């Protein structure tokens, strides 16, 4: 029996990146042998065991054969005669198919170390094409390692394109699509994930609402990049610089979905695209079963981001309506979320990437004024029921009106 460290831990250590979890493969052993040693079996479809002390995963070396559609349609064979090379052959990318023995020797039959040095993501074998989930995984790895200069091998991209055209992606469950997408949104360059999906044809299959934005023009005065799809990915890239939050990044991705509904005869203008996009956000989130908090912020950003761009010109009552709509009184974190996504939108344009966003400070100051109105004083005045709400609203509006008179109108 021989045990090897495999997969991401080997890859990340070779890249001098922190290793967060370790996976092991066991060659030349049976389930009975591992159970006798105190390992606990957890895998139902294939033999995976937890180490009795470290609780890390140890899997028996196995091969997989395609037996049905989708990413679950595989027959697994695990036995003592399966070699390490056999096990590594079934893995997705060469950089993930490197093993390290107990004495520190690397076993690298598919030249993963060379691809790591050359910063290339390349599939191990044509069996890659049997698992549609791998299209998303490669796009996610491209996003994760983009800052290190990694690119996808042309032959791998070609295979991914064939997979997107084959219809196999429809076998992916909504949960798996969102799980990979959520991981991609957490990377340093989440826009790369969606660009890769577009380049191989998968975006049109999985995210048609986003695909539809490419080729839709916006006025060159405000959008020198012109193309709304390009602007969307630029906005996502800026959002990733501003915040690690998935909610903010996803909202940035979806902020202009409504522009995909504008009739061509109205191009390049998109009046009412914000509210129009709310239904598309709902549709996308329902289809992929995206968590409600992520959905709710994306809907608010789609509807109100343009309003925030002109916040200094808003009347006190409109400012209050905005605060009420985003429920900032009960969810004060929403204020920063809305500001950051709106800033990402403003800066996600060619030539505007490093511009300040004074609207953010203006909105923060306005909220401080409105939030400074004492609820206790209103209650103590003897009012009851809805009259309390109406009086609080009146006082907040008055406070904002007085504050606005002291403000110079900045050029926004």
Curated annotation (Swiss-Prot):
Give cofactor(s), names only. Mg(2+); Ni(2+)
Keyword annotations from UniProtKB, A to Z = ATP-binding, Hydrolase, Magnesium, Metal-binding, Multifunctional enzyme, Nickel, Nucleotide-binding, Nucleotidyltransferase, RNA repair, RNA-binding, Transferase, tRNA processing
Which molecular function terms from Gene Ontology are attached?
ATP binding; CCA tRNA nucleotidyltransferase activity; cyclic-nucleotide phosphodiesterase activity; magnesium ion binding; phosphatase activity; tRNA binding
Q: Which residues bind ATP?
A: 8, 11, 91, 137, 140
Q: Which CDD domains match?
A: HDc, NT_ClassII-CCAase
Which reaction does this enzyme catalyse, per its entry? a tRNA precursor + 2 CTP + ATP = a tRNA with a 3' CCA end + 3 diphosphate; a tRNA with a 3' CCA end + 2 CTP + ATP = a tRNA with a 3' CCACCA end + 3 diphosphate
Sites binding Mg(2+) sit at 21, 23
User: Which InterPro entries does the record match to this protein?
Assistant: CCA_bact (IPR012006), HD/PDEase_dom (IPR003607), HD_domain (IPR006674), NT_sf (IPR043519), PolA_pol_head_dom (IPR002646), PolyA_RNA-bd (IPR032828), tRNA_CCA-adding_enzyme (IPR050124)
Question: SMART domains attached here?
Answer: HDc
Question: What GO biological process terms does the UniProt entry carry, in alphabetical order?
Answer: RNA repair; tRNA 3'-terminal CCA addition
| Signal peptide region | none
Q: EC number(s)?
A: 2.7.7.72, 3.1.3.-, 3.1.4.-
Q: How is the cofactor bound?
A: Magnesium is required for nucleotidyltransferase activity.
Q: Where is the HD domain?
A: 228-329
Cite the domain annotation text. Comprises two domains: an N-terminal domain containing the nucleotidyltransferase activity and a C-terminal HD domain associated with both phosphodiesterase and phosphatase activities.
Additional comments on file? A single active site specifically recognizes both ATP and CTP and is responsible for their addition.
Q: How does it assemble?
A: Monomer. Can also form homodimers and oligomers.
Job description of the protein:
Catalyzes the addition and repair of the essential 3'-terminal CCA sequence in tRNAs without using a nucleic acid template. Adds these three nucleotides in the order of C, C, and A to the tRNA nucleotide-73, using CTP and ATP as substrates and producing inorganic pyrophosphate. tRNA 3'-terminal CCA addition is required both for tRNA processing and repair. Also involved in tRNA surveillance by mediating tandem CCA addition to generate a CCACCA at the 3' terminus of unstable tRNAs. While stable tRNAs receive only 3'-terminal CCA, unstable tRNAs are marked with CCACCA and rapidly degraded.
This chain's protein is named Multifunctional CCA protein
- Name its species: Yersinia pseudotuberculosis serotype O:1b (strain IP 31758)
> Gene name?
cca
């Amino acid at each position: 029996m021989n045990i090897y460290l495999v997969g991401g831990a080997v890859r990340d250590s070779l890249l001098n990146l922190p290793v967060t979890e370790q996976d092991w493969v066991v060659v030349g052993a049976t389930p009975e042998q591992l159970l006798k040693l105190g390992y606990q079996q957890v895998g139902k479809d294939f033999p995976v065991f937890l180490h009795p002390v470290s609780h890390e995963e140890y899997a028996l070396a196995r091969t997989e054969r395609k037996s049905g559609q989708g990413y679950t349609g595989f027959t697994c064979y695990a036995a003592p005669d399966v070699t390490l090379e056999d096990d590594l052959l079934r893995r997705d990318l060469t950089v993930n198919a490197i093993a390290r023995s107990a004495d520190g020797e690397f076993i690298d039959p598919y030249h993963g170390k060379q691809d790591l040095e050359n910063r290339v993501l390349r599939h191990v074998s044509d069996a890659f094409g049997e698992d549609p989930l791998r299209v998303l995984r490669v796009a996610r790895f491209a996003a994760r390692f983009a800052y290190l200069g990694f690119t996808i091998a042309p032959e791998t991209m070609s295979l991914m394109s064939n997979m997107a055209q084959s219809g196999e992606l429809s076998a992916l469950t909504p949960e798996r699509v969102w799980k990979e997408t959520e991981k991609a949104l957490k990377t340093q360059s989440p826009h790369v994930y969606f660009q890769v999906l577009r380049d191989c044809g998968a975006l049109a299959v999985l995210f048609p609402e986003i695909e539809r934005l490419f080729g839709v023009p916006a006025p060159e005065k405000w959008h020198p990049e012109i193309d709304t799809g390009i602007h969307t990915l630029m906005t996502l890239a800026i959002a990733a610089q501003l915040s690690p939050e998935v909610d903010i990044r996803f909202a940035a991705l979806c902020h202009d979905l409504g522009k995909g509904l504008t009739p061509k005869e109205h191009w390049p203008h998109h009046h009412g695209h914000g509210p129009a996009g709310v239904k598309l956000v709902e549709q996308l989130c329902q289809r992929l079963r995206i968590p409600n908090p992520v959905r709710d912020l994306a809907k608010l950003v789609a509807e109100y981001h343009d309003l925030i761009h002109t916040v200094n010109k808003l009347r006190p009552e409109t400012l209050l309506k905005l605060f009420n709509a985003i429920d900032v009184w009960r969810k004060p974190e929403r204020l920063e979320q809305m500001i950051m996504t709106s800033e990402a939108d403003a800066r996600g344009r060619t030539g505007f990437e490093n511009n300040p966003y004074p609207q953010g400070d203006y909105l923060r100051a306005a909220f401080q004024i409105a939030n400074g109105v004492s609820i206790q004083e209103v209650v103590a005045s003897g009012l009851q029921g809805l009259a309390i709400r109406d009086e609080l609203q009146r006082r907040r509006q008055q406070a904002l009106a007085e504050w606005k008179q002291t403000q110079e109108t900045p050029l926004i």
